[in-house]
Amino acid sequence: MSNSSRNATEQNNKCSAAGVNSVAAALCPLSNCQFSGVVISAIADEQKLEFNNIYKSSCTLSCSYDSQGVLVRIMLDNDQGHVLKEYMLSADTDAAQLGKRSYAVSLESDNLVLRFASDKDQQLFRKVVENVKHLRPKSVFSQRTEESSASQYFQFYGYLSQQQNMMQDYVRTSTYQRAILGNSIDFQDKIVLDVGAGSGILSFFAVQAGAAKVYAIEASNMAQYAQQLVESNNVQHKISVIPGKIEEIELPEKVDVIISEPMGYMLYNERMLETYLHARKWLKPQGKMYPTHGDLHIAPFSDDSLYSEQYNKANFWYQSAFHGVDLTTLHKEGMKEYFRQPIVDTFDIRICMAKSVRHVCDFLNDKENDLHLIDIPLEFHILQTGICHGLAFWFDVEFSGSTQNVWLSTSPTAPLTHWYQVRCLLPMPIFIKQGQTLTGRVLLEANRRQSYDVTIDLHIEGTLISSSNTLDLKNPYFRYTGAPVQAPPGTNTQSPSEQYWTQMDTQQQQQGSRNSNSMLNGGLSVNGMADPGMDINLGLMHPH
């Protein structure tokens, strides 16, 4: 028996002894389960049962739990650091045993034959398939989300005040309405699905555009308030509010259009986009998605003030005599915690040191799995010399309609929204010169707290200079105060003092010119109106 199969057997026995009948327990033997020495073939001729080896050498199959079943990764035995292919093993996977060591399995669009190194390995893999097929988890959502996180999430969106905060975002709400009403041809007499409907405002827009029926899905307590709005506006024959998660509910029919507002900070936070993509199972072929795709923009920035602010906060823990207590042992952890916080605020785009890199998420075609691990390569051509303190993030989404395309932007050059922008600091900033190239990557790794761990890795090309950081998108620092955005230092090309006095002189000259014109006209000016024929002496009292 191989070490991998022995480990899987031991884990299987432990779970059986525990007698736990949960999804996690049922999948327990799959944890860190690997099968080495597997020969993978494709069916070349079904009638003659002829097979062709896909890879030149034997492979290792790695099986790990995923929210949709089991993720199977294929690697070469002699190069396990490189994943050749990934497949999702789900309850719908077709599979069959072929003899004692082989197994035929249909994974996505590939029909494969797996020949294992031993009978025992084949039996264990068959157990993997059987476990997945017998699982009927409550929902994809419940598998990817901690119960405590889900509870807080739906409680938060169940408050009217939070719905009001989003509805009063004029840019957000008006852009959605314009996108829907401006493409009424996509909604006229159509069946519409509103995912995460909240108050139902988008459902009302769909009805305004002529929708025949709207299914408004809302998992929080806000569903009851949405129902009240539907009834008070007499559109209950048009809008059907369905309490629940889209991953769990059933619709009576397929839909023509899906509408939703699934974006979070940095586009991906809250993992609502996965729910939005999951809803496509109810979308008719050639159906529409509003919005259609999202662009995440990333740019290096320089901001000494922000960096110093966070650094000085952490220095609280550098005190050796705080009320007689030495805190310095926690300074390193304090520094780490503050720099793990993404900063949510807004800024002048002139702090960006290069043109932003754009990463596209295609809501019509991307899969939910694509959002579990998002790897974004970076290459910036630096436009100004300075200190790079980290990366700035914002996003745009496009509504691609049949009549017109409409964009909703959270760029620092666009009107401010409740998404603001997000900045991720480097604990060790790097000095970079104009003309140099900054390369690296951003890795967004989904977690069960409905958020992402964000890893930044930057390197100045042609040097040994690099810097990195990992941040917790679930725990941002909300820095926005409402104060006007200040221009970055060094952007004045003229004396601000002289500019001010010149402006004052100009205003005084203009005022003097207006007064002179009034006197020359010989009239009395009242609220800017004058009668040139009026005698200004009339009505004046003279001493006797």
UniProtKB/Swiss-Prot annotation:
One Pfam match, given by its short name, reads PrmA
Keyword terms: Chromatin regulator, Cytoplasm, Methylation, Methyltransferase, Nucleus, S-adenosyl-L-methionine, Transcription, Transcription regulation, Transferase
Gene Ontology CC annotations of this record:
cytoplasm; cytosol; histone methyltransferase complex; nucleus
For the biological process aspect of GO, one term held by this record is:
regulation of DNA-templated transcription
Organism, by scientific name, is Drosophila grimshawi (Hawaiian fruit fly)
Q: What is this protein called?
A: Histone-arginine methyltransferase CARMER
InterPro entries (UniProt xref): Arg_MeTrfase, PH-like_dom_sf, PRMT_dom, SAM-dependent_MTases_sf
The positions making up the signal sequence are none
Per UniProt, the ranges with Polar residues bias are 505-520
GO molecular function terms noted in the UniProt entry: histone H3R17 methyltransferase activity; histone H3R2 methyltransferase activity; histone H3R26 methyltransferase activity; protein-arginine omega-N asymmetric methyltransferase activity; protein-arginine omega-N monomethyltransferase activity
* EC number, as in UniProt: 2.1.1.319
Q: Taxonomic classification, please? A: Eukaryota, Metazoa, Ecdysozoa, Arthropoda, Hexapoda
User: Could you state what the record's PTM comment says about this protein?
Assistant: The dimethylated protein is the major form.
Entry binding sites for S-adenosyl-L-methionine: Q163, R172, G196, E218, E247, T275
List the gene name.
Art4
Q: Does the keyword Iron-sulfur apply?
A: no
User: Could you list the residue ranges forming a coiled coil in this record?
Assistant: none
Family note = Belongs to the class I-like SAM-binding methyltransferase superfamily. Protein arginine N-methyltransferase family.
* Region (Disordered) location: 505-527
Which positions does the record annotate as the modified residue Asymmetric dimethylarginine? R514
Q: Which PANTHER family match?
A: HISTONE-ARGININE METHYLTRANSFERASE CARMER-RELATED, PROTEIN ARGININE N-METHYLTRANSFERASE
First-level EC class: transferase
Q: Where in the cell is it found?
A: Cytoplasm; Nucleus
